[in-house]
């Protein structure tokens, strides 16, 4: 995955930037895992296995949520956007 690497020399990056990179890459991986589990559930014929896969998928959602909150607490602009756009009935595309 190209997102795992750095675009600038690592020795020029602060600890905060490297930690944010770790969190963003981890969030991407968790969301990718949710997608993979959704596909497996959709293709699976065994109902018991579907339940297990759904449980695993939902744990990935928990992990993604924790990472998103960690990012929100450390990135003020991201925090502002999330607070304005999440958990309301306003149009998503509003400016």
Write out the residue ranges for each language-model feature.
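Iron-associated oxidoreductase/ferritin-like identity signal
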Residues: 1-95
